Every structure is written in C-alpha cells, then in structure tokens.
C-alpha cells in the first residue's frame, strides 16, 4: 500500500541523508550507490553476484557487504513506485550521479501508474567556487533547493532509458549516437557522458584522462594517495566523479601493471593504502613525454561502462581533437 504521507528521497550515497533530516525534509531515504558507469553489466541470471564482485574488487569493500547493500537497494528501488506517492531524486551533474539517475529513470520507465517523481539536479551553488556535489551543501542550503524540484517528464524517462542502454553497450557507438541527439531533457547528461568516454584510452598516448592526470600530478614529485586524490579530483579533473576508493582502483591498476608507470615508495608499502607514497617511474615519464603508448605496454584489462579496454579488446580510443570515440585499426 502506498504511504500517502511519506516522501522517498533517492540519492547515490548517504552523504546528504542526515542533512535532509536536519533541514526538516522528512521522509525515507534510499542510497542507490551502484556506480552505473562501472562495467561490465553481467548477465541477468548472475547479475547481483557479478555486480557485487565487480564493485567489491574496484572499491576494496567486503563482497558480502556490497552484495547485501546492493540487493536491498535494488529491491527498494523496484518497490518504490508501489510503496510511495511522492519520490524525490537528488542527483548532481557529474558522471557518477548522472549514470545513477538514468539507471533509476530506466527502471521507472518500465512501470505503469508512477507516483509523483521529482528531480533536484544542479551543477553549481551560489558562494561555492568549485561545486563538486550536493554533499558539500549544508542542511540549510539543501533546504533551499526543495522549492526548485521539478516533476519528471516522459521525455526524461525516455532519454534515461536510451542512455542506460548506451552505457551498457559493448562499443561507444550508441553513446556517440545519443550525444548527437537532442538531450536537453536532462541538461547535465551530455557533459557527463562525454567525460565517461574520456576514460577510454586516448589516441595520443593510450592513457585515460584519469590516468594522465595521475601521472602529470606525480611528475611534480611524490605524493601520498590521499594527496594525489585531492590534486587530481579536486583540482585537475574538469568534471570529477570518482570517490577515493574508485580512484585508488585506477592507481592500483597502474602500480600492478607489468610495466608500471607508478610505484609505491618502499618505506610505505605496508601503510594503509591512502597513506602510501607514490612516485613516477621511467615508464610513467616516457608516457608523459609522448614516447610510449600505454596500450602497447600490457596494461591491466578494464571496462569503461560496457566497453572493454586493454589487451585483446577492440582498440576504441578517445580522440581529443575531434572529441569523439574512434576505433584504431
């Protein structure tokens, strides 16, 4: 039975849960934190276990905990239209949020008789010079967004469905087709998906944008993982979307590759991961100098949404000149 009184707030994380209560925005809270930009999507019959294993591997969190939380989140998402008369989605402009948003919209698009579903989505806030996300805001600032919520339209549901299918595709071609279409129904989605494609190897050096920013930051001198995260995600990245755990998984792949461009200083190898001191290797300097292509150095296999990257995969690249994905022959 639908609860006529309570609101369900949906967000990709717990960062504003307490603040909403403090602001007097009563209701239940669903943390739908599945990183929808992270692939590949496993077959349906192995979906939950496969998804939990992938997220646990990339985040370093215990797999049983991830599986339990993921299962509950998807169960609650499936039940939400039947259990509530009012649902409010809180998603900012970055890739993590926009990918989660289209996943939620694709889910709701399959339902009939939706309740009132509204969206609060921003890319800036007065007084904050570099707006990263809703988690930066105080309870009072979050409360000021409440009157600006807008009801989800059929166009948004349709665009979310198409975007979710494109994110899961094995090639970037559906994403490119989507980016060439009218995406004004979700005004922050286009930039977020462009940023997603920039995680493909680049035509210039075979590095993703995050990998290149990592090497460039270390070229100035050794940094701890925490310092490196702050430098790349808080300062360098034009549209940051990774939390520290997922950023560490990118760095870890660079460290563990056969010809690593990044190394851990010997004295900190047993330290907690965020305190380990990192330095650039000769391979890293050669990559930054344009003397090597990272895809020719046996990097560890990875996924960009549904697109495989690395040894043996079709060589899809991001071309920074054309600002489109292209396949090298």
Predicted regions span which residues?
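A conserved mid-domain beta-alpha-beta active-site/ligand-binding segment of alpha/beta enzyme cores
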Residues: 139-219
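Charge-enriched amphipathic alpha-helical scaffolds
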Residues: 212, 233-267, 284, 291, ...
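Long, hydrophobic/aromatic-enriched structural stretches that serve as scaffold segments
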Residues: 60-110
């Amino acid at each position: 039975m639908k609860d006529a009184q309570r609101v369900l707030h949906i967000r990709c994380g717990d960062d504003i849960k307490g603040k909403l209560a403090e602001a007097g925005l009563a209701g239940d809270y669903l943390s739908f934190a599945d990183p929808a930009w992270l692939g590949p999507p496993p077959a349906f019959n192995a979906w939950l276990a496969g998804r939990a294993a992938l997220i646990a591997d990339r985040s370093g969190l215990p797999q049983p905990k991830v599986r339990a939380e993921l299962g509950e989140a998807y169960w609650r998402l499936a039940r939400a239209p039947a259990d509530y008369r009012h649902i409010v989605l809180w998603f900012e402009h970055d890739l993590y949020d926009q990918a989660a948003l289209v996943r939620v919209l694709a889910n709701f698009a399959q339902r009939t008789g939706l309740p009132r579903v509204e969206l609060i989505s921003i890319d800036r806030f007065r007084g904050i010079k570099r707006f990263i996300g809703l988690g930066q805001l105080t309870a009072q600032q979050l409360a000021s967004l409440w009157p600006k919520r807008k009801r989800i339209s059929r166009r948004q549901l349709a665009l979310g469905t198409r975007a979710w299918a494109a994110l899961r595709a094995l090639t970037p071609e559906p994403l490119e087709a989507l980016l060439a279409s009218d995406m004004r129904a979700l005004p922050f989605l286009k930039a977020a998906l462009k940023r997603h494609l920039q995680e493909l190897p680049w035509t210039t050096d075979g590095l993703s944008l995050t990998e290149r920013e990592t090497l460039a930051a270390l070229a100035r001198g050794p940094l701890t993982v925490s310092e490196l995260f702050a430098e790349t995600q808080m300062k360098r990245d034009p549209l940051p979307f990774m939390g520290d755990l997922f950023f560490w998984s990118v760095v870890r792949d660079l460290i563990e590759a056969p010809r690593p461009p990044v190394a851990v200083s010997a004295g900190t190898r047993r330290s907690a991961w965020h305190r380990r001191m990192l330095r650039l290797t000769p391979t890293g300097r050669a990559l930054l100098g344009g003397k090597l292509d990272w895809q020719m150095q046996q990097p560890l296999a990875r996924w960009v949404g549904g697109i495989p990257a690395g040894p043996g995969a079709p060589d899809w690249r991001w071309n920074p000149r054309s600002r489109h994905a292209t396949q090298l022959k």
